[in-house]
């Protein structure tokens, strides 16, 4: 049982965050690690809180202590190893997995995790082998069928489709999010087989399950976007003190499924760029600004009136979190979703930052979003109408920020990049302050872990085959067209 002091430290950390005092919250979590017990169920909550504010080292250590809780539990260990893989500590995860006894190593959920690790690293043949081994032991694992569906291409008459259809009635008894994931996998199978109407019905069924669990409030986001566009003007931003942190930083922004992972992969293929991903660290660094509005930024600046470089401090914290995440001070590519909501503060805080903003055909992007089972943070993607509303807001933000920062934001059209990489890759490199290197033109050969839904696409050469993919679903996209075009 946790002592009163231990409970108080965690509650005090939460209270500090409510006051936007991120530094105090981190101090309390570090103190908890120093003085807290070596194990216990409560460490899972500590890990989750630390992850939310970007303190990955604390999150990992707390997850490790949770995994050591008595009595021994494979489920807790799997949670810890999954956290390690999420933060690119796959070598450590594999090391511990390798110490399991042969019977434990052949548990279906262990095989599933090993398959996930293999897939993230681009070894799809090994991932498929491990998933099939898991399914041979337990054919009724919906999540493993989904994982297998994401890395293979189905064909008419594929026995895997029949096996998934046979399992479908049983999935009605599992929790909705797991059933939804399975339905997305089955939909992808029928999509591969060219059965687009059947696939769309399954995607819609899965999306309805997710929508019932996770509602999106378009009116709230519209108010937020209205405020950003109204308040963040060149004249208003002159009220913010300049940032003294001039280190370069690379960002790739754009809607999900718009080609952001492709550009990330191209940049990571440069010798000066160490890695990249959806790291979710800028939001954490900006916690002291509160709601990320201009008023919040001015309040933060007022609280820090006695400090020499308040915006440089936030930038330094961001770079510290990046170094913790990737283990390097070299350049990394941050392609976290929805940086458009913080773009004004991002470019003010990081005067050395350069942004590549991807744009893609709206209907192709909308369909791809609707067909993707996002794990979190994309509640608008469970409805074609909501996708249209979200895209309209993002269009407004792109127009606003690119007009305000034309020298720092480069807009790249996915269709043009895919069709003419020899023209666009040098332009992207120049914008990011990089010399062109041959490896950037063969980015699919760059080996690294990829955690996004584009894990397969970045392993293949740049191609135009994904342009126009929405045509097969055109009759189903009318709800998107109505809300997007107004």
What would you call each of these model-derived segments?
Residues 16, 50, 84, 118, ...:
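Residue at a conserved register position within TPR or TPR-like alpha-solenoid repeats
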Residues 146-152, 161-173, 182-246, 301-302, ...:
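PAPS-dependent sulfotransferases, especially Golgi type II membrane carbohydrate sulfotransferases
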Residues 240-350, 354, 358:
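Phosphate-binding active sites in nucleotide-utilizing proteins
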